[in-house]
Design a protein with these regions (language model features):
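N-terminal periplasmic "start-of-domain" segments of outer-membrane beta-barrel proteins
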Residues: 32-67, 85, 93
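Gram-negative outer-membrane beta-barrel transporters
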Residues: 603, 608-613, 630-723
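N-terminal periplasmic accessory domains that precede
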Residues: 26, 64-67, 84-87, 99, ...
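Flexible loop and strand-edge segments within Gram-negative outer membrane beta-barrel domains
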Residues: 24, 321-328, 343-407, 412-436, ...
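C-terminal beta-signal and adjacent terminal beta-strands/loops
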Residues: 208, 556-557, 612-615, 717-722, ...
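Short acidic/polar hinge/loop motifs at secondary-structure boundaries
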Residues: 104-133
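Outer-membrane beta-barrel signature, preferentially recognizing the C-terminal barrel domain
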Residues: 378-400, 522-541, 545-547, 554-613, ...
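Transmembrane beta-barrel wall of Gram-negative outer-membrane proteins
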Residues: 175-201, 212-354, 387-398, 483
Length: 794
């Protein structure tokens, strides 16, 4: 019974190493216990990282991307302080699948980066991160990895007590305030109920200096760089003027006849020491130019840039990220029946969020004035408002004396409205009707063979409204069948997996949808894709002290609806976004080699990976701009991604002064264009722009009786591998982030436990700008924050 319950707990239980592989774990006698840390599961068929609730207490932030950015190989997309998606090995959005208890959530970050992932972090119990392709398990949208987030809406095992309550109160100097509670109890012998709610609000986010990068005001950089002007959201009054200091002489003839012959400065300044007088047919000396500076190039230096003024779209205030407000709340209720071999549960969750993006746009592009005075352009702040309803169902059954070990069924229905606002005006809104279901069948172990086979069905209806709608109404259907088999020969283990997916994309344009003048999705053709996913890996265990492994993945991804059908001004990214309904599926072949050692209390691991993409889909510059919008098109070319990751840690039991763990890491990723395309080299360069930079970091955690401490220091290096935005990409300065958490547990009340804690974020108060953030010129990371809170468990 105990094994059955544990099997049913995980949202992705078929991939749990202790069950899928039935591995024998022999604990070392001198291993220090009671310190929970992020552990790379070397004996898993996938390169996974498991993050416990205890670890989340230290690293949890406002967004999922910022929370997971403390993990090697993962960074934050950083679309302002209130929106951030995980970036795994330079990939995010439509290439990183986010799941809740094994079922896909409503994630629109791949369609528009200002949307947040629909996850309530206070209800997360555990996160499993797949840093390599997980497409066999979860389909093509996991071509770059996946996150499986375990929440507590549905109870899967009977609680120890008939009534349990958890509460949280927290306030911070630069993180606002939040409250949360959850409760569960036993209704009858086998029935359990759950209920919970949370609330969060913050007025503004403070920073150590100015919100915009100082280079936004450098006339030598922004004077004639329209793309950088757009990224900085500035108006520049600039012009090209004749370089008078280039010419050694002034034409006397031009001075005498300037008005008569309607001459210009180009005629006035000359390289000739004499001029011809047609009145008498003689040559006379020209006067010298007092402004003349010798040594200049007659062609390159003929004209010079003159910047007369730089003005922000909207004036910013020092020490504050503009439009950085946020508020959110959620509520859930659920019930479960838990029997000896069967459990069935259902839950409902409602969530609301409203937050600002540190950028501005205009509701309507001004028309040409035809010589009349141009009216003043009024820019409005970009805000995001989301309302989501989720219905969840989960059931599992454990067999005995039967070829099938267990069967599990998950369903999630999502009904949401996700609006992009200009101030309070609804510019664009997506109404989502999404249904996902997943069936997993795990077979009984046959000597050295275990495995799981499953079926997954997904449906999404996305309807758009608003004056700045940039996508037609779309419908997506996906169905996939997969199997993952594990062969265990003790010191050598193998994994083999295959998945077949069928994907449909449909666009339904109506009369209210006005397309741009660009490609704008072509003919909005119906598209059908057949995808094949394959995984294989081998692992050699070395004297129970370490391992060597190699894995190969073949993954395929169907283009998303925005890549196929977008066709209008997407104000949130200040781009006229043009999809291409002719795009082919994306194909990736990945090889990863890794190894690790576990010597008593010392652990070290490292891995190298290389992914070759065919038809890598990216949003490319065209070199054209219309009004304030850059014109971009979704294109595909061959790309290569490679990188390394390394970790090490040491645990020590120091007796009276506690149990401690010290660790360190390093990561590097490069996203390289290998296509023989002169257009891509011209527009985007040799490397993909906005690529995550390399990092290294150190951590210390431990506990002394009821006290615990966590410290982390992460250093982000200056990017060496730069792409282009037509013009060469600018690197962000290197920076370091120091975070600390101190906590004390008090169980003297007799009815439960209290935990008092203090958290310090960015304690160095560093101006930190993420190289991979699209808003890096507008917004740094938040400045120093000190939070204090209390948790109660009854």
């Amino acid at each position: 019974m105990k094994r059955t319950v544990y099997f049913l707990v995980g949202g992705t239980l078929m991939y749990s190493p202790s069950l899928l592989k039935a591995q024998k774990i022999t604990p070392e006698k001198k291993i220090v216990k009671d310190i929970e840390s992020v552990q790379v599961q070397g004996k898993s068929n996938y390169n996974t990282v498991n993050i416990s609730r205890k670890k989340l207490d230290f690293i949890q932030s406002n967004t999922l991307g910022e929370t997971l950015s403390k993990i090697p190989g993962i960074q934050n997309s950083g679309y302002g302080p209130n929106s951030g998606a995980p970036v795994i090995r330079s990939l995010s959005g439509n290439r990183v699948k986010i799941l809740e208890n094994g079922t896909a959530v409503n994630d629109l970050s791949g369609i528009s980066p200002d949307f947040n992932t629909d996850i309530e972090m206070n209800n997360v119990q555990n996160i499993t991160v797949y840093k390599n392709s997980a497409s066999v398990l979860y389909g093509g949208k996991a071509i770059g990895g996946a996150l499986d987030i375990e929440t507590d809406y549905i109870v899967r095992q009977l609680p120890d007590k008939k009534f349990n309550v958890k509460g949280l109160l927290e306030g911070g100097s630069n993180s606002g305030q939040k409250q949360a509670f959850s409760a569960k109890g036993v209704i009858a012998k086998n029935w359990v109920w759950t209920v919970g709610a949370s609330n969060q609000k913050q007025e503004m986010v403070r920073i150590p200096g100015k919100s915009k990068d100082s280079r936004c005001y450098d006339p030598n950089l922004v004077g004639f760089n329209s793309i950088l002007q757009s990224l900085c959201q500035i108006d520049v009054n600039s012009r090209r003027v004749l370089n008078k200091s280039l010419f050694p002489y002034i034409s006397q003839f031009a001075k005498d006849h300037m008005i008569e012959y309607e001459l210009s400065e180009d005629d006035l300044y000359t390289f000739s020491s004499t001029y011809y007088n047609p009145a008498d047919g003689k040559y006379y000396p020209n006067p010298k130019n007092d402004l003349y500076v010798p040594g200049q190039d007659a062609v390159k230096d003929r004209y010079k840039s003159e910047v007369n003024g730089i003005k922000d779209y909207v004036e910013t205030k020092d020490g504050v990220i503009p439009n950085s407000h946020s508020e959110s709340n959620s509520f859930y209720v659920g019930t479960s029946y838990i029997g000896k071999s069967l459990y069935v549960g259902g839950a409902y969750q409602n969530s609301y969020s409203y937050f600002g993006v540190p950028g501005y746009a205009i509701p309507k592009i001004p028309k040409h004035s035809h010589g009349k005075p141009q009216p003043k352009i009024e820019y409005s702040p970009i805000n995001i408002r989301s309302l989501s309803h989720k219905a969840m169902f989960e059931s599992g059954y454990k067999f005995t004396h039967f070829p099938i070990s267990s069967i599990k069924l998950n369903y999630m229905g999502v009904f949401s409205k996700n609006a992009e606002l200009l101030d309070r005006y609804r510019a664009n809104q997506f109404a989502i009707n999404q249904h996902n279901s997943r069936l997993e069948i795990t077979q009984q172990k046959l000597r050295f063979l275990t495995g799981t086979t499953g079926l997954e069905v997904q449906y999404r209806d996305m309807e758009g409204t608003g004056g700045q709608k940039y996508l037609p109404n779309t419908i997506s259907r996906e169905i996939g069948v997969f199997t993952m088999q594990h062969l265990d020969f003790n010191i050598i283990q193998f994994d083999l997996g295959y998945r077949n997916d069928h994907v449909q994309r449909r666009a339904e344009a109506d009369n209210k949808y006005v397309r741009s003048r660009g490609l704008s999705g072509g003919k909005l053709s119906d598209r059908d894709f057949t995808l094949h996913q394959f995984h294989s890996s081998a692992q050699w265990t070395l004297f129970k002290k370490g391992y060597l492994k190699v894995q190969y993945n073949h993954s395929e991804r169907a283009p998303e609806v925005n890549e196929l059908y977008s066709g209008n001004n997407h104000f949130a990214i200040l781009t006229e976004e043009n999809g291409d309904d002719r795009l082919d599926k994306e194909t990736a072949n990945t090889v990863e080699i890794g190894g690790g050692l576990n010597l008593k209390n010392f652990r070290v691991s490292a891995s190298w990976y290389n992914t070759s993409y065919k038809n890598y889909i990216y949003l490319a510059h065209t070199g054209i701009s219309r009004e304030i919008f850059l014109v971009k098109e979704w294109r595909s070319d061959d790309t290569e991604i490679n990188g390394i990751e390394a970790e090490a840690s040491y645990k020590a039991d120091l007796g009276k002064i506690g149990k401690w763990e010290i660790g360190g890491y390093y990561d590097l990723v490069r996203n390289i264009s290998v296509a023989d395309s002169s257009i891509r080299k011209w527009s985007d360069g040799d490397y993909m722009p906005n690529m995550p930079t390399s990092r290294f970091g150190f951590s210390l955690e431990g506990n002394v009786q009821n006290f615990s401490m966590n410290v982390s220091l992460d250093h982000y290096l200056k990017q060496k591998y730069l792409g282009k935005n037509i013009n060469p990409e600018l690197p962000m300065p290197a920076f370091s982030l120091l975070n600390v958490r101190l906590a004390y547990k008090d169980n003297s009340l007799g009815i439960g436990d209290l935990e008092y804690y203090i958290i310090g974020n960015n304690l160095l108060n560093t101006e930190a700008r993420l190289q991979n953030s699209q808003l890096k010129f507008l917004s740094p990371l938040p400045g120093i924050n000190i939070s204090a809170g209390v948790k109660i468990t009854i």
